[in-house]
């Protein structure tokens, strides 16, 4: 069996009374190296973990993870973007030159470009690892960015006002689907079909066409993903799954806490992993999930997971022991 290294990343570290935890309580901005950690790596499908949090301030609120080529990055709400240095084993902040905001909700690294989606200021791109930034908002009708991804060599942005795709030939965004009231929280691809998870349900269409249709009504989704040929819809009380591309759905919560929702579902090699409110779960069979928290702090809401170079990166925010 092939093994895939795994990173787990934990965002804003809070105690149960809401106070930020650092090694020195008097220095909220000091880079942390605590038993709780902010980032964890695993080389054995989550069976064991090592804390790899050097360089990240203790008061960060992590928002996203992205990786491509030799770059692995995290975005935050206060401190901008950090890149991981595999030589030093530390996270280093990239420059926050104007006009980019330090308040970043969506991060995408693709073909040596870094895209940052902000809350209210649209999308920025850097082609020199953050030395300089350019705003790319032409045609973008909503500047609050929820998600950034590339599908079939085209850049997509999920916003608080619909799904947009970037037309390189025109150097501007065009609305792919939705209206000013459609919040797009997740974007996924399966067999040449694009899926979006929104505040008004799940929709799908053939890639690069406009034959959108509602496939999961009466549900508010905070994310959607595909893994092992299955579509996973993450609503605010349960995980739903579809084996027939959204035609039929079933609850897929067995083995995970009742009433607690999943943040992410990803495929790593021949296994499927779920980021839940209390840690990481592995799909044991078609009907059950098994917890994989050996070596991790207790009660970690794992909000982000990404696979990169045989590595899985997982993130969280606002947790307590």
Over which residues does each language-model region extend?
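Bacterial N-terminal signal peptides
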Residues: 5-14
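Beta-strand initiation motifs
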Residues: 47-50, 88-92, 131-134, 170-174, ...
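An edge-strand/N-cap motif at the start of beta-rich repeat modules
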Residues: 17-58, 65-67, 72, 86, ...
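Conserved Ser/Thr-centered positions that define the repeating blades of beta-propeller domains
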Residues: 42-43, 83-84, 126-127, 165-167, ...
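Short coil-to-beta transitions that initiate beta-strands within beta-rich domains
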Residues: 22-26, 53-68, 95-110, 137-151, ...
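Loop/turn residues immediately N-terminal
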Residues: 37-39, 78-81, 120-123, 161-164, ...
């Amino acid at each position: 069996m092939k093994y895939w290294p795994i990173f787990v990343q934990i965002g804003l570290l809070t105690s149960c009374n809401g106070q930020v935890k650092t090694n020195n309580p008097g220095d909220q901005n000091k880079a942390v190296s605590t038993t709780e950690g902010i980032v964890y790596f695993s080389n054995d499908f989550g069976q064991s973990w090592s804390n790899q949090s050097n360089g990240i301030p203790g008061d960060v609120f992590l928002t996203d993870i992205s990786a491509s080529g030799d770059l692995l990055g995290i975005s935050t709400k206060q401190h901008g973007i950090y890149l991981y240095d595999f030589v030093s084993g530390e996270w280093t902040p990239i420059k926050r030159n104007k006009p980019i905001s330090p308040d970043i909700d969506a991060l995408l690294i693709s073909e040596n470009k870094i895209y940052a989606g902000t809350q209210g200021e649209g999308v920025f791109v850097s082609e020199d690892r953050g030395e300089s930034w350019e705003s790319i908002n032409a045609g973008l009708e909503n500047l609050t960015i929820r998600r950034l991804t590339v599908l079939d060599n085209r850049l997509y942005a999920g916003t608080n006002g619909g799904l947009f795709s970037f037309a390189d030939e025109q150097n501007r965004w065009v609305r792919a689907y939705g209206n000013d009231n459609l919040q797009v929280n997740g974007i996924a691809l399966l067999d040449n079909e694009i899926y979006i998870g929104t505040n008004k349900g799940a929709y799908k269409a053939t890639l690069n066409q406009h034959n959108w249709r509602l496939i999961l009504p009466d549900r508010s989704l905070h994310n959607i993903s595909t893994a092992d040929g299955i579509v996973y819809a993450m609503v605010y009380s349960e995980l739903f799954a579809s084996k027939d591309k959204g035609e039929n759905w079933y609850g897929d919560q067995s083995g995970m806490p009742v009433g607690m929702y999943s943040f992410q579902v990803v495929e790593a090699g021949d296994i499927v992993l779920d980021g839940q409110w209390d840690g990481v779960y592995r799909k044991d069979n078609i009907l059950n999930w098994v917890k994989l928290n050996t070596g991790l702090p207790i009660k970690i809401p794992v909000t982000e997971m990404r696979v990169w170079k045989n590595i899985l990166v997982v993130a969280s925010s606002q947790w307590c022991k």
